C-alpha cells in the first residue's frame, strides 16, 4: 500500500497560492505598465508643445504690438490716460491815453450739462438739487428737466453763459453729477455810452464785432495754450507730457482821453436834446500829433446791455455818415486863391448878385463888395464863387485832397466812408465850380473835416490821424504855404470874434460855421446840418474841433446858433483841462492893419477905394 506524503503536498499548494495572490508577481500586469509609460510621455510632449506654441504666440503678439500696430495701440492707450487741459489767454484790455480802462474782461463761468452722464447717474431724481439749479439759472424745474431729456444723446449742453462767479460757486456746491463749470470771460465797458462808438463791443465768445474791438481783434485775442498730462484711473496726474505755450493778448492804448471823451459826449447829448435834433457828432484832434482825443456821437447805446438796441444807434456817425460840408470849406477856397495868385491879400471882391446856368448865387447877408476877410466873416457864397471861377476846377480839388477830403483816415475803424469829391472830372459847369466852393456837390465825414482843420492848425502841415497813442509825434508833410495858412487862421479868429458864440474866455479861437441842406432820395429837403469847425489857441494851435448837429428842429438851425455854443464849451474845457496857456491878453494889444481896398468887378480891376 502506497502512502502519500500529504503534508508536503499541502505545503506546495500553499506556496503556489502565495505566489498567485502577490500582485507584484502577477504576469498579466506587465502590459499595463508599458501603456502607462507611453501615455505619460505623450502627455508630457503635448504639454511641452502647447507651452512652446503659447510662448511663440506671445512673442509674435509682442512683435506685432511693438512694430506692426504700435501707433494704433499707443493711441488707444493715450485716449484712456492722456488729458489735454486748456490754458486760457485772457483778451487784452482797451485803455485810454492815460491808462484808464475803456474795455476789460471780467472772469465768469459757463454752466454746462452732460445729459448722458446725468441720465446714467440718475441725477434728475434729486429733485431738491435740480430745483435749486433751475432757480439759479432762471428756469423752471420742469423746463430744465425737459431740456436735458431732449438732448439725452448729447455729452455737452450749455445751460447758461457768462454766469457771475457767486452764482457759479453756489452751483458748484450742489455737486450734481453731469453738471460742469467752465471758466470764460465777459467784456465790461466802464464808460458805458460815452465811448461806445469808438470802443465797440464783442460777442459772447469774445470776438470783436464793432469799433476798436473788431479793428484790433487780432491783437486783443492772443492765443490759448495747453498742458498735456497722463492720469491714472483715479484722475491723479502721474506724468507731465508737454506744454503748448500760450501767447498773452496785447492791451491797446488809444489816443482817446477818457475825461475829454466823457465831456464831449455829454455836451453833444445835451445839444441833441435841446435842439430836438436827429443826432450830433463831435471830433477833437491834437494838431501836433494827429491823435484823435475825443470822438463822440449821440444818441448812443449801452454796450454792456445791447438787448433791444437798434442797429442805427450803433453807428459811429463820425466816420459812417457823410454830409455836404457847407461853408466849412470856404477857408480852403480863399487859401487856394492866394496860393494860385488869382487874388491879392488886400483885394476887394465884387459880391453883387449874379447867375450861373440860370441859377442865382445867393448870400444870406448880401453886400456889394467885400474883402477876403469879410467874405469869410460874412460867409459869402458869392465871394468864394467869384474866387473859384478864377481858377481851374483842378486847383480847388487839389487843395481839398491835400486837406484830406475824399481820403480815408486809415484809423482802421470798420464802416468808414470817404465821401464824394469827383476830383477827376474832366468837365465842370460854372454852376458846379461855384457850388463846390461853398460846400455843395461834395460830401465828407465829420472826422475828415476835423483832419482838414488840423492841417490849418499846423499852418499847412498835413499829418495822418491816429486812434492809438502816438509817441513820438509824426513830422507830417507840408501841403500849404505857412504864410498863407497863417493868414487864413488869422481870418478865422475874426470870424469867431464876430460870431461870439464860439469864443472861449481867455483864449484866441478861430472858427468857421456852416449850414447845409440835407439830401433825401436825391433831392434837397428842408432839413439842415449845422457845423462849427475851428482851432485854438490861435497863437500856438493845439486842438482842432468839429461839431455837427444833424437836423435841429427846435427853431434855429444855423451853425452859428446851434453848434457854435457847443464848440465853445468843448474847446474851453479841453484847453483848461490840459493847462494850455491863455493867449487872449496878447491879442488885445495887437493892431490890425487896414487893408487897401482895391475893387475888382468880375475879372477887371477897378479903382482903389479907401
From Swiss-Prot:
Locations listed in the record: Cell inner membrane
A biological-process GO annotation: peptidoglycan biosynthetic process
Sample GO molecular function, one term: penicillin binding
Topology term for the membrane: Single-pass membrane protein
Transmembrane segments: 43-65
Catalytic activity: Preferential cleavage: (Ac)2-L-Lys-D-Ala-|-D-Ala. Also transpeptidation of peptidyl-alanyl moieties that are N-acyl substituents of D-alanine
One Pfam family named in its UniProt record: PBP_dimer
Gene Ontology CC entries for this record: plasma membrane
Pathway: Cell wall biogenesis; peptidoglycan biosynthesis
Active site: 327 (acyl-ester intermediate)
Cited SUPFAM superfamilies: beta-lactamase/transpeptidase-like (SSF56601), Penicillin binding protein dimerisation domain (SSF56519)
The enzyme's E.C. designation: 3.4.16.4
Region called Disordered, residue ranges: 1-24
Swiss-Prot/TrEMBL keywords: Carboxypeptidase, Cell cycle, Cell division, Cell inner membrane, Cell membrane, Cell shape, Cell wall biogenesis/degradation, Hydrolase, Membrane, Peptidoglycan synthesis, Protease, Septation, Transmembrane, Transmembrane helix
Known role: Catalyzes cross-linking of the peptidoglycan cell wall at the division septum.
This protein's name: Peptidoglycan D,D-transpeptidase FtsI
Amino acid at each position: 500500500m502506497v502512502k502519500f506524503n500529504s503534508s508536503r503536498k499541502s505545503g506546495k499548494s500553499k506556496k503556489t497560492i502565495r505566489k498567485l495572490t502577490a500582485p507584484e508577481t502577477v504576469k498579466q500586469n506587465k502590459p499595463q505598465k508599458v501603456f502607462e509609460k507611453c501615455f505619460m510621455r505623450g502627455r508630457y510632449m503635448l504639454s511641452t508643445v502647447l507651452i512652446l506654441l503659447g510662448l511663440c504666440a506671445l512673442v509674435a503678439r509682442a512683435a506685432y504690438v511693438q512694430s506692426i500696430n504700435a501707433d494704433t495701440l499707443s493711441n488707444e492707450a493715450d485716449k484712456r490716460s492722456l488729458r489735454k487741459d486748456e490754458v486760457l489767454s485772457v483778451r487784452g484790455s482797451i485803455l485810454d491815453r492815460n491808462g484808464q480802462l475803456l474795455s476789460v474782461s471780467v472772469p465768469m463761468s459757463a454752466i454746462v450739462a452732460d445729459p448722458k452722464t446725468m441720465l446714467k447717474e440718475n441725477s434728475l431724481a434729486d429733485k431738491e438739487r435740480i430745483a435749486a439749479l433751475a432757480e439759479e439759472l432762471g428756469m423752471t424745474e420742469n423746463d430744465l428737466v425737459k431740456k436735458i431729456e431732449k438732448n439725452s444723446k448729447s455729452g455737452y449742453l450749455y445751460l447758461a453763459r457768462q454766469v457771475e462767479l457767486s452764482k457759479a460757486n453756489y452751483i458748484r456746491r450742489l455737486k450734481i453729477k453731469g453738471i460742469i463749470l467752465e471758466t470764460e470771460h465777459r467784456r465790461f465797458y466802464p464808460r458805458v455810452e460815452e465811448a461806445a462808438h469808438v470802443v465797440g463791443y464783442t460777442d459772447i465768445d469774445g470776438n470783436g464785432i464793432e469799433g476798436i474791438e473788431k479793428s484790433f481783434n487780432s491783437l486783443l485775442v492772443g492765443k490759448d495754450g495747453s498742458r498735456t498730462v497722463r492720469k491714472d484711473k483715479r484722475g491723479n496726474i502721474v506724468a507731465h507730457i508737454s506744454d503748448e505755450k500760450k501767447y498773452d493778448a496785447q492791451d491797446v492804448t488809444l489816443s482817446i482821453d477818457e475825461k475829454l471823451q466823457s465831456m464831449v459826449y455829454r455836451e453833444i447829448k445835451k445839444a441833441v436834446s435841446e435842439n430836438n435834433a436827429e443826432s450830433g457828432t463831435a471830433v477833437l484832434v491834437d494838431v501836433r500829433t494827429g491823435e484823435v482825443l475825443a470822438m463822440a456821437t449821440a444818441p448812443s447805446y449801452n454796450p454792456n446791455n445791447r438787448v433791444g438796441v437798434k442797429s442805427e444807434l450803433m453807428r459811429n456817425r463820425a466816420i459812417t455818415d457823410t454830409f455836404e460840408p457847407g461853408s466849412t470849406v470856404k477857408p480852403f477856397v480863399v487859401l487856394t486863391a492866394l496860393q494860385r495868385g488869382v487874388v491879392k491879400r488886400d483885394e476887394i471882391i465884387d459880391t453883387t448878385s449874379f447867375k450861373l446856368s440860370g441859377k442865382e448865387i445867393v448870400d444870406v447877408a448880401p453886400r456889394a463888395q467885400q474883402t477876403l476877410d469879410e467874405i469869410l466873416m460874412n460867409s459869402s457864397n458869392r465871394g468864394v464863387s467869384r474866387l473859384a471861377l478864377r481858377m481851374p476846377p483842378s486847383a480847388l480839388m487839389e487843395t481839398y485832397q491835400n486837406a484830406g477830403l475824399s481820403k480815408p483816415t486809415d484809423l482802421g475803424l470798420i464802416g468808414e466812408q470817404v465821401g464824394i469829391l469827383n476830383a477827376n472830372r474832366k468837365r465842370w459847369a460854372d454852376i458846379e465850380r461855384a457850388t463846390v466852393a461853398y460846400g455843395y456837390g461834395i460830401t465828407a465825414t465829420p472826422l475828415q473835416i476835423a483832419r482838414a482843420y488840423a492841417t490849418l492848425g499846423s499852418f499847412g502841415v498835413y499829418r495822418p490821424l491816429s486812434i492809438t497813442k502816438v509817441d513820438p509825434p509824426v513830422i507830417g508833410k507840408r501841403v500849404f504855404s505857412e504864410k498863407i495858412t497863417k493868414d487864413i487862421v488869422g481870418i478865422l479868429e475874426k470870424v469867431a470874434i464876430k460870431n461870439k458864440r464860439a469864443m472861449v474866455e481867455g483864449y484866441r479861437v478861430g472858427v468857421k460855421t456852416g449850414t447845409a441842406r440835407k439830401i433825401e432820395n436825391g433831392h434837397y429837403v428842408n432839413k439842415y446840418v449845422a457845423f462849427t469847425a475851428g482851432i485854438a489857441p490861435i497863437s500856438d494851435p493845439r486842438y482842432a474841433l468839429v461839431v455837427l448837429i444833424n437836423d435841429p428842429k427846435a427853431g434855429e438851425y444855423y451853425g452859428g446858433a446851434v453848434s457854435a455854443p457847443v464848440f465853445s464849451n468843448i474847446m474851453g474845457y479841453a484847453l483848461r483841462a490840459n493847462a494850455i496857456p491863455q493867449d487872449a491878453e496878447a491879442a488885445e494889444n495887437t493892431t490890425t492893419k487896414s487893408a487897401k481896398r482895391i475893387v475888382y468887378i468880375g475879372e477887371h480891376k477897378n479903382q482903389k477905394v479907401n
